[in-house]
Amino acid sequence: MAIVRHKQPPLRRFMMYWVDHARQAFSSLGELWRNPLASLMTLAVLGVSLALPSCFHVLLKNAEVVEGSWQTSSQISLYLRKDLPEQSILDMKQRILLYPEVESVTYMSRDEALKEFREISGFGDALDYLDSNPLPPVLSVIPDPRWQNPEGAAELLNKLNNEDGVEQGKLDLQWLTRLQGIMNLLRHTITGIAVLLLSAVLLIVGNTLRLNILNQRSEIEVLKLVGATDAFIHRPFLYTGIWFGVIGGMLAWWLTEVMVIWSEGVVNELAGLYNSNFRLVGMGAVDGINLILLGALLGLIASWFSVHRHIRDIEPS
C-alpha cells in the first residue's frame, strides 16, 4: 500500500525553518555553559583582543576632538593698512564672511589691539611714551572645518591676501602640517594594530572550534552515517562561533568603558592644567553595538572556515 505524504504549506515550512535555527542557536549557547572553564578562558581572550582595538578607537576619537579644537584655534590674522577707513574694514569683514571657506570673522580695531598688547606684554608704561599707535587693525578669520587643513588654509590665505587693504596675512602652516602628520601617523598605527588584533580573534575562534569538532568526531560520524546534510552538521558550530563573537564583543565593550572611566580623572586633571573643558568621550551605544556586530561577523567567518576545513575530513569508517 502506497504511503501518502501530505505536503506542508509554505508558511509552515518557513516558520519551521526559523524555529529549527532558533533551537540550534540556543542549543549552541548551552554548549558553552556545559564547558564553563574552557568557554570562559576563550571568551576572556576574545574580550581582551576586541577591547584593545576598541580602546584605540576611543583614543583616536578623542584625539580627533582635540585636533578639531586646535585647528579651530589656528586662525588667519589679516593685518590691514593703518589708514583704512572704519567703514571699509566693516565692508571687508562682511565680504569675507560670504566666502564659503570662512566660518567666522572677528574685527579688532587699532585701539583694541593696543589695549590687548598693553595687557599681555607688560610694557604698559613704555607704550605711554609713543607718539602714535603703531599697531594696525586686524581681522581674525576662522576657516570652515572643511578648510582647516594645510592645503585648504593656504589656499584661503592666498585668497584673503588679494583683498584690497590687506598688508599681510599670517597663518602658522608649519604647525598645521605637523598636527596633520601626527594624526595621520596615529590613524595608520591604530589601523595596523587593529588589523593584527582582529586577525588574532579569527585564529582564536577558528582554533577553538577545531578542538570542538575533534572532540565531537564520533557524533559527526554518526550524523553522516544516518544521512544528515552538511548544513545540518555545520549549523551548531557556526552558531557557536557567532556566540563567541557576540559575548566577546559585549565583554570588550564593558572593558573599554571601564578603561574610559578609569582614565577620566587623570584626563580631566590634565585638561584643567591647560584651562580646557575637554572631557573624555566613551564608545557610546552605536559604537558598542557595532563592536558586538563586528565580533559576531568575525566569529561567523572564523567558524565557517574552520567547519568547512575540518568536518570535510571526517568520514564514517
UniProtKB/Swiss-Prot annotation:
Transmembrane segments: 40-60, 189-209, 242-262, 281-301
Residue numbers on the Periplasmic membrane side: 61-188, 263-280
Subcellular location, record wording: Cell inner membrane
Pfam families on file: FtsX (PF02687), FtsX_ECD (PF18075)
Major subcellular location class: membrane
Listed GO CC annotations: cell division site; Gram-negative-bacterium-type cell wall; plasma membrane
InterPro entries: ABC3_permease_C, FtsX, FtsX_ECD, FtsX_proteobact
Coiled coil stretches, renumbered: none
Gene3D superfamilies: 3.30.70.3040
Side Cytoplasmic, residues: 1-39, 210-241, 302-317
Membrane-topology annotation of the record: Multi-pass membrane protein
GO BP field: cell division
Keywords: Cell cycle, Cell division, Cell inner membrane, Cell membrane, Membrane, Transmembrane, Transmembrane helix
Family as reported in the entry's similarity comment: Belongs to the ABC-4 integral membrane protein family. FtsX subfamily.
Quaternary structure and partners: Forms a membrane-associated complex with FtsE.
Entry function: Part of the ABC transporter FtsEX involved in cellular division. Encoded in an operon consisting of genes ftsY, ftsE and ftsX.
Name used for this protein in its record: Cell division protein FtsX
The organism of origin for this protein: Aeromonas hydrophila
Lineage per the UniProt record: Bacteria, Pseudomonadati, Pseudomonadota, Gammaproteobacteria, Aeromonadales
Gene name per UniProt: ftsX
